[in-house]
Amino acid sequence: MKAKFHEYLTRFRKQKGYTQAQMAEQIGVFRSTYTNYESGNRTPDYEVLERICDVLDCSLDELFGRTPKYVTNCNVIREETTPYHVTARQEEKPRLAIGVQNFRDLREKHAYYVDKTQFIEEFLDSWYQVTLITRPRRFGKTLNMSMLAEFLDCTKDSADIFAGTKVFAGSQWQEMNRHPVVFLSFLNVKADSAGALIQALKDTVRAEYERYYTLFGDERLPEFQRKEFQMAYESLHAGSERKDSESYVIRSIMILCQTLNLYYGKKVYLLLDEYDTPFMSANSGEYYEEVRSILNGILSTSLKGNPFLEKAVLTGIQRIAKENIFSGLNNLIVCTVQEKEYDDCFGFTEKEVRELLAYCNVEFSDELKKMYDGYRFGDTEVYNPWSVSCYAARQKLESYWVNTSENSILRNALEVQGDSFKKEYETLIQEGAVEAVVDFSMAYYERMDEAALWGLLVNAGIVTIEEAIEEDYYRLKIPNLEVWKVFKELTACHLRIDERQMEKMLTALKRGNMERFAEEYQRILMELPSCHDLKDENSYHMMMLGMCAFLRRDYEVKSNRESGLGRSDICLYAKHDRYPNLILEFKYTKDEKEDLSELAGEAIRQIREKQYDAEMKGKVHYVGLAHCGKKTCVSWE
């Protein structure tokens, strides 16, 4: 049926005197999409078929050749209305396409698009030959790289998908589809073993080779180059038995650049998305030394001493320094999150968020801002684009951003860091901000000190820069409420407690269910790996304060603050009437014979006598917590 359809479609269009471009415009699709309809490579959906029938003044039966007598006379008046044909209707608004990372797919779906094509102009206007951009996961890196590839690639016809964008009216428009491009995404080059990771790397590069498969036998290429191209391609297959296979894999990207340079007579643009994923996977899988030579070699040969390279851009989470990938590159710029370059190209600005929400008939609110805003790239304040898009689609203020791969690294890092980092981390959790030395110059796994770890936390989007105090010294903050969820998991790991038990305990506390709170608190203490860290009253105080930090959405958390006639341990000021205010006072004894219930009662009396609730309005719960090792008693009123 498809074969008949595309023949009849072409015939009807020509009899009506329309060009393909005119047809595409009238039915609301890209010209390239319509061309695929007539070539038989694509079939329109039902709604598009209806629009085609309206434009060509025919029925679906006629369009599919089910009533041949009409085909030769398109001016005949229809004798009856077919059940398929409907009158023309207003075209639906573009929908959100959540998770689509291919620019062409996004545009051909007529999906809503937050225009980031200024990235193309800024990149092409740059003087640097190699650009490295570090940004968190799900901040639009892959989509932007796909967009750049579509714009530059001389094998594409991209005018339709860039129509109406910023770059369409810019100074670099004439560069569209004028250059050979090698575009590789290492997003999925990760595995549990060295062999599996190397094969994933080969598969990714081989797929780009296959895009240019017709060059294998093209006589416009010198024979030696065709042979070189073929041998590199064969080496990228699983189970290659060539003795020089590894050498060809290491040089495979450069060989592809060389081939394209000879064929098209122009130097190549190299785009490497998520370049650091295989390095991070190999390190977390503890097989890095097995793959080091290939990972280092394939990137080094592509970027250094590659005479066929016009410009390259790489994106990832962090800069890898020790492997010498970037050493010796005199024309390199590294754009971390504190740099001004490309600061508005990744993530949504508030203006873009408001426009998106208005388009979706969703109201902008302070609650949304607190949940998803708070990042700072260069001089630009940005929102998490993934979370905002999900919220616009679902209209539920939830946590959508999951950063699993980085979280595993951070959990391991918390285990090995010393007291200095732990104190800074506790300050961050308790106050929401901390001042620290930050190192952006290399990946954390290359130098596992606290400055490099803070650099990873910033680049991964777990914390953001609030203020640059001096060189390498910053005030950092947790960007928003959504990221507090990540810290809840990390803090549970840091305190060596179960996250779900912590959640149960905190829920019971804010609901005023003190019996349940006491049970969960005792359970947490009993399941701690050791009681050696619980050596005084302050130890319990700090542990509880770290957990109470995750009540910030509903409470203002204060510790050791002057109130009434003294300093309270922890005061929780309710932000909503539905929750009670809470005052927690801690007591400790080494004497196992001392009555803990009496000690907890003493804490309650202290709260009352010192009038710690003097500034609180509404319902207040007093909570006294007495401890001896892992044993506790909780009193309340």
Where are these regions (language model features)?
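A short, Lys/Arg-rich alpha-helix, primarily the initiator
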Residues: M1-Q15
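Short alpha-helical DNA-recognition segment
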Residues: G17-S39, R51
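DNA major-groove recognition helix of helix-turn-helix/homeodomain DNA-binding modules
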Residues: D45-E62
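Short, charged recognition helix plus adjacent turn
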Residues: F64-A88
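P-loop NTPase motor core
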Residues: G99, D115, D153, D157-L215
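Substrate-engagement module of ASCE P-loop NTPases
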Residues: Y209, S252-N261, E290-E310, Y612
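Amphipathic alpha-helical segments of the small helical/lid subdomains adjacent to P-loop NTPase cores
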Residues: A321-L329, C335-Y391, E424-I429
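Extended alpha-helical interface modules used as scaffolds for assembling large macromolecular complexes
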Residues: L332-I333, Y383, V388-D613, T632-E637
